Regions:
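Catalytic active-site module of serine/aspartate enzymes centered on a nucleophile-bearing elbow/loop
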Residues: 283-304
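Gly/Ser-rich "nucleophile elbow"/oxyanion-hole loop immediately N-terminal to the catalytic nucleophile
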Residues: 134-149, 169
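Alpha/beta-hydrolase active-site loop
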Residues: 117-139, 294
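Gly/Ala-rich beta-loop-alpha elbow adjacent to hydrolase catalytic centers
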Residues: 151, 155, 159
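A glycine/proline-hinged amphipathic helix-loop "lid/cap" segment
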Residues: 1-62, 288, 302-304
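Short beta-strand/loop motif that positions the catalytic acidic residue
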Residues: 240-242
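Short amphipathic alpha-helix adjacent to the substrate-entry channel of hydrolases
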Residues: 89-108
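Hydrolase active-site cap/lid region
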Residues: 164-218
């Protein structure tokens, strides 16, 4: 493990998802300890997207972005938290980092959480925000031809599911997928999913519990677990980042390979010495490189 990251391991609480309410409290405490990047160059606004039910979003607009007549590029961003934890506040540091690093308008989505709201609630919320963003692009100052979806962990899996659904339903055009350590496969059969039993923060048992909460009694579909999709053709280009010590690692590597075989352009980065979510340790040099690359990949993909 990267020495700078290893020094922080004792500070990470050992948590499980047996009690979702308690897990959310611990997750909020951990997120509150993450330094919030400077928002001086951002206009931050809370909005509500009309849907059934309404979906809260937080919009981050970089002030320094060069004005473009047809509007700014945008990212619909979905937070991590195993489908069970997280909200607009816990995601504030990440969304701020991405907006500052990319110069792109970031729309952070406060989707409904499992187990109270199992699949497809979170996916429906995410898709509703994508449609709203595209339909109201002019009012939002956004270029409808430069909209990306992305997310971390469970949010990365949601973003991949949104891309599949948009393709199948001929929904809004998605320019790019930004998938950071995404949760893609409920079957948990890969080597990393089976063997990473004691990795920091996120391990085999926690991953399995997250999927149980999210799916409930319903069978998994490709929209819930994108690795189950048989056809990955005609999807948006993707950037996929994996962490070496992460149960999701191998399913992410396999998904990237399958996208390539389906004719989808993919940029893949496997970060050695890192673990799931270790980018939150922003003082570490490797975390700074990871976060900078997320912004740079998005900036390249959405360039006018």
């Amino acid at each position: 493990m990267d020495p700078e990251l290893e020094a922080f391991i004792p500070l990470f609480p050992r948590t499980d998802l047996a009690d979702p309410v308690a897990a959310r409290g611990r997750f909020s405490e951990l997120a509150a300890a993450v330094p919030v990047p400077d928002t001086t160059d951002l206009d931050v606004e809370d909005r509500t997207v009309p849907a059934d039910p309404a979906v809260p979003v937080r919009i981050y607009r970089p002030r320094r972005a060069d004005p473009v007549k047809r509007g700014q590029a945008a990212l619909v961003w979905l937070h991590g938290g195993g489908f069970v934890m997280g909200d607009l506040d816990t995601e504030h540091p990440w969304a701020t980092l991405i907006a500052n690093g990319s110069g792109v308008t970031v729309i952070s989505v406060g989707y409904r959480l499992a187990p109270e709201h199992p699949f497809p609630a979170a996916l429906d919320d995410a898709y509703a925000v994508l449609r709203w963003t595209a339909e109201h692009a002019a009012a939002l100052g956004i270029d409808p031809e430069r909209i990306a979806v992305g997310g971390h962990s469970a949010g990365g899996g949601l973003a991949a599911g949104v891309a599949l659904r948009a393709r199948d339903e001929r929904g809004p055009a998605i320019r790019f997928q930004l998938l950071n350590q995404p949760g893609l496969d409920d079957r948990q059969e890969t080597w990393s999913a089976r063997n990473f039993t004691d990795t920091p923060w996120f391990n085999r048992d926690k991953a399995r519990a997250a999927w149980r909460h999210y799916l409930g009694s319903a069978p998994a579909t490709p929209y819930a677990a994108p690795a189950r999709a048989e056809d990955l053709s005609a999807l948006p280009p993707a950037y996929i980042a994996t962490a070496e010590l992460c149960p999701n690692r191998d399913e992410d590597l396999i998904y990237a390979q399958r996208l390539l075989q389906a004719g989808v352009s993919v940029e893949l980065h496997q970060w050695p010495g890192t673990f799931h979510g270790s980018q939150a340790i922003v003082s570490a040099e490797v975390s700074q490189r990871q976060n900078a690359e997320l912004g740079a990949a998005l900036r390249r993909a959405l360039a006018g």
